[in-house]
Amino acid sequence: MATRIKILPEQLTNKIAAGEVVERPASVVKELVENALDAGCSEVMVEIEAGGKRLIRVSDTGCGMTREDALLALERHATSKIANDEDLFSLATLGFRGEALPSVASVSRFTLATREKGSLEGTEIYAEGGRIKEVKACGMAEGTVISVRNLFFNTPARLKFMKSSETEAGHVGDLLTRLAISRPDIRFIYTNDGKTVFRALNADLRERVATLLGRTLSQDLYPLDFCDGQLNVTGLVGKPECSRSAASHVYTYINGRFIRDKVVQHAVLQAYRNFMERGRYPVVVLFISVPAAEVDVNVHPTKHEVRFREQGRVHDAIQEAVESVLRSSPWVKTQPVVQKTQASTSIAAARIAQVRESLTQYRPQKTTQQSFKMSTPAVPASFRETSLPDPVPVADAAPAPEVERGYFSGLSVIGQFNAAYILCQDGNSLVIIDQHAAHERVAFERLKTQHAAMGVESQRLLFPETVEFSFKEGAVIREHQTELDRVGFSLEEFGGSTWLLNAVPHLLSGNDYVKTLRDILEELQSLGRSRSFQDILEDILARIACHSVVRGSHCLSQQEIKALFQQMDTTEFSSNCPHGRPVLHTLTLAEIERMFKR
């Protein structure tokens, strides 16, 4: 017989509802801070301990609540923000469902202290697992203070899914960054385990972005102000060269609410399509303002997705707004193709690297035209012996493996095509070699060998470089600092969101190593419980290898080609680059003759 249908007890339904609203400590912070903003506060302070697992405390200077309202606030679907159907489609607040406080209280030890403006005393309510244990009067400043202790103490299954304290703190910092950017007129203070992570004072948007994302980045952002009827788009648009490997720095807001909407993101990427390489994401802060009746925010539990009444019009307006800034910006006028910007940056980086070489005498001087960094004798002798052998006759090598390993050295070089492909003859066949892919494979195998031995060889910088990271990136660095050191990046905290970069992988010296590091951090942020650093180690080494070699067209001398082929002969899997792309393609004489109908 089938199980009878029955009504679930309230305590169980509260936990089920909490699962939709409260996913991790950052979810709690989101709900509490949004309530504070809706209350008209001028300052929000967020304090956490153990990444929010032990304590989350949010204090605000908002309007506060009476004793009766405070008790009602812990009842499900009790809210002061909407009253009828019409209000649901003309929302002017971040919250409106009346689910946040009871959901949080049902999975924690919860304390709410509040005092309404003009009242002589406040009210303090203590609840445990959703049940109110104590209500009393208290003395406090006007506003509200909510403390959430021992999150998920009564739902151990959910507790198991939480990450390390550093990771959870990073998520909280990332969440607060989004909220603080949306309201530069409000002071935000964030502390973790008693240490102030950031203090964002009242400021304009650019200054707020500088505080949270870094002053260097803020200087590469251009203002945007676009109007199309009742649709307004304002904010800051980043240079294409500030791109990221993920959409973590695409901050989009609809009527003040942070969203991750596919329509909006597609419009932004379309605007950048001619200025940025595929697979990269820009840095933008966009505020989209439309009449409340033109957008539905009640389509997802987290309210990150929205539905526009005129989706096409919104998409086109956003794309046009961003494109208008990109078309008129100085870097586009002087260098209309982004590759030229990257090339000039590479030249400048190369010159800096050459000055460092001369000062430190770390490695023998090389010519500025040399593109293949792996051929420099700066690595330990053990690696030079296997990866960079001196030119020797093929006959001197061991006879058994020589047929396979000497393939590339045995090719007859015809020349280069488009300064990117090496044309060779092998008997009656034409062999076309992608020199960039070949360099990548050699560099990748060297990095793997170094990492397996004593770690990737690093190059200490003459002067440590200060780099500003987001709070989420900083949390990733702290969690994986040892592993990052083994792949060549030596970092130490310098205060706030600034870190000192002391050393970089040797193969990246002279290249944009900061961009490579940011890409690696983006990759590490995507790690789940089922994946570890070791699982993506080869992806990281492949990224370093890719960024270490010359991209695009570059003429190679006969000696450089010879050195490359010698290294290819001693490299495993030399037929493909680390990303799986082919290194060479062969056309037989018969195939060529068929092309010409012979």
Curated annotation (Swiss-Prot):
SUPFAM superfamilies: ATPase domain of HSP90 chaperone/DNA topoisomerase II/histidine kinase (SSF55874), DNA mismatch repair protein MutL (SSF118116), Ribosomal protein S5 domain 2-like (SSF54211)
Keyword NAD: no
GO molecular function: ATP binding; ATP hydrolysis activity; ATP-dependent DNA damage sensor activity; mismatched DNA binding
Keyword line: DNA damage, DNA repair
GO cellular component entries: mismatch repair complex
Function description: This protein is involved in the repair of mismatches in DNA. It is required for dam-dependent methyl-directed DNA mismatch repair. May act as a 'molecular matchmaker', a protein that promotes the formation of a stable complex between two or more DNA-binding proteins in an ATP-dependent manner without itself being part of a final effector complex.
UniProt record similarity statement: Belongs to the DNA mismatch repair MutL/HexB family.
Name recorded for this polypeptide: DNA mismatch repair protein MutL
Species, as recorded: Geotalea daltonii (strain DSM 22248 / JCM 15807 / FRC-32) (Geobacter daltonii)
Phylogenetic classification of the source organism: Bacteria, Pseudomonadati, Thermodesulfobacteriota, Desulfuromonadia, Geobacterales
